[in-house]
Design a protein with these regions (language model features):
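His/Asp/Glu-enriched, well-ordered alpha-helical/loop segment
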Residues: 224, 328-332, 340-427
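Metal-associated gating/positioning segment near the N- to mid-region
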Residues: 80-148, 172, 213, 234-252
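Active-site core of metal-dependent hydrolases
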Residues: 204-339, 358, 365, 385-386, ...
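Histidine-rich, glycine-flanked metal-binding segment
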Residues: 36, 40-83
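Acidic/histidine-rich helix-loop elements
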Residues: 93-112, 168-185, 254-260, 328-335
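Divalent metal-dependent hydrolysis catalytic cores, especially in the metallo-beta-lactamase
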Residues: 117-140, 157-164, 197-207, 228, ...
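Bacterial N-terminal signal peptides
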Residues: 7-17
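Divalent metal-coordination and catalytic microenvironments
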Residues: 34, 50, 55, 79, ...
């Protein structure tokens, strides 16, 4: 059916008694007039109309082809870009920009569930992030906050949580959210415990410090329970072992100052991406935090905005401020200026090797606030890494939904899918940084901004 005939059909349906009854029975919204970037990568739809009925999208068309139901709440998107809600595939809602991890981990565990994690979730939503993958947190707190968001008790994106990291040995003082494994049986038992608790994904790190059999056990057990596995890619051996074990998605572009990935690693990646029967190999490079560090160091007033205070008590805000008072002194970033020049080459290598990149930010790490990390990552991809805006947007919408196995429900603005939609004044395909100030946020049909 053509878009025009489909629009006429919808208009007739809505004008019928059945259509009128449906409109009266459920809250209906109509986003009218904007340029729709639907997530599929095709030409934007000018003068778009998106009809939202309850939590789902009822119809998509144009002003010329799709009538607005009588009594619907009309939301003008004239002069705006309309997009699927953004995904951030690598966040840490248990932290919020504080620079001293030891202090944070000792001071705030009893405030994670009720204060800090809800504040982080709310900030992400206000930034236009309607879905996020939370990679590393206390198990019970992560599940509780995810479920509270899903029940509508906490404003936030739909969260896909990993719970604790799985690794060889937890760093001292981090046992609450890092689980060590000792042998194959223990590796499988830890993953089963996560699966039975209801996590959405398993996060594996430091796999180069584990035995090969342990790494395979983690991945195999996760897959047995229908869970994808993400793994760190800081060091070449982490990548080698992860690929051999069947890791689904790698995180980061490495903390080394090596100018590029070794040839054998690239060859192994290409071997994996050639096996399309296994689906795409996903990779979340998280480059913005490294790339923008020197800018923040030299322009610390950029940290003075109060947007990242949302939901945080004043004493926590002051504690965070104190921790980042001297950006140039932070141990976390001392090697970053030497890493920065390697990022473009590594991104190019990954793209040339057939990897599907995903937008993710490591949001929550020192000076990386949930309120603005995601648009900054998109901006760096386009402005510095040479990635086309449409490709970057699809890496924050369509591809993450596919990676998480939920593309039937989210990731594009399509009839029948959940109404996760954002709108922003201006043309984001020309000026991607317009996403720094999202004007409209709908999640599951509820307007939050």
């Amino acid at each position: 059916m053509s878009r025009t005939s489909n629009g006429i059909f919808v208009a007739l349906l809505l004008a019928s008694p059945i259509g009128e009854a449906r409109a009266a029975a459920a809250p209906v919204k109509a986003l009218v007039g904007g340029t729709l970037i639907d997530g599929f990568g095709g030409p934007p739809i000018q003068d778009s109309v998106v009809i939202v009925d309850g939590e789902r999208i009822r119809a998509v068309g144009t002003v010329a082809t799709l009538a607005v139901p009588e009594g619907a709440e009309v939301i003008s998107t004239e002069g705006m870009s309309v997009l699927p809600g953004l995904w951030d595939m690598h966040v840490h809602v248990m932290i919020n920009g504080h620079a001293d991890y030891v202090h944070w981990d000792e001071t705030y565990p009893d405030r994670f569930r009720d204060v800090i994690m809800p504040a982080s979730a709310h900030q992400l939503l206000m930034a236009g992030v309607t879905s996020a993958r939370d990679l590393g947190g206390p198990l019970e707190d992560s599940i509780a906050v995810r479920d509270a968001v899903n029940r509508g008790e906490i404003p936030g994106p739909t969260l896909y949580v990993s719970g604790p990291f799985i690794q060889h040995r937890p760093y001292p003082g981090t046992e609450l959210f890092r689980w060590g494994v000792e042998g194959v049986d223990d590796a499988r038992a830890k993953v089963r415990r996560l699966a039975e608790a209801g996590v959405d994904v398993v996060k594996l790190i430091d796999q180069d410090q584990m035995t090969v059999d342990e790494v395979h056990a983690v991945v195999d057990e996760a897959h047995r329970h229908g869970l994808t596995v993400v793994a760190h890619a800081h060091r070449p051996e982490e990548i080698r072992r992860g690929l051999a074990a069947g890791v689904d998605c790698f995180e980061h572009t490495g903390l080394s100052t090596a100018p590029e990935y070794p040839p054998d690693v690239i060859a192994a990646i290409r071997e994996r991406t050639a096996q399309m029967n296994r689906g795409p190999l996903f990779w979340t490079p998280t480059v913005e935090g490294l790339y923008n560090y020197t800018y923040l160091r030299d322009n610390p007033e950029k940290l003075d905005g109060d947007e990242w205070h949302l939901g945080l008590p004043e004493e926590i805000v002051l504690d965070i401020r104190r921790s980042i008072a001297h950006p140039d002194r932070l141990p976390y970033f001392q090697a970053t200026p030497a890493r920065k020049p390697t990022l473009r080459r590594k991104i190019d290598q990954l793209r040339e090797s057939g990897v599907q990149l995903l937008i993710g930010t490591d949001s929550g790490i020192p000076m990386k606030f949930h309120i603005d990390s995601t648009w900054n990552e998109l901006d760096i991809w386009v402005r510095v890494m040479g990635i086309e805006p449409m490709e970057a947007i699809r890496s924050a919408t369509y591809w993450p939904a596919l990676a998480m196995g939920v593309a039937d429900d989210v990731g594009t603005v399509t009839e029948g899918k959940l109404a996760d939609i954002i709108a922003v004044k201006g043309d984001v395909l020309r000026y991607i940084d317009k996403l720094d100030d999202v004007d409209i946020v709908l999640k599951h049909g509820v307007r939050h901004k």
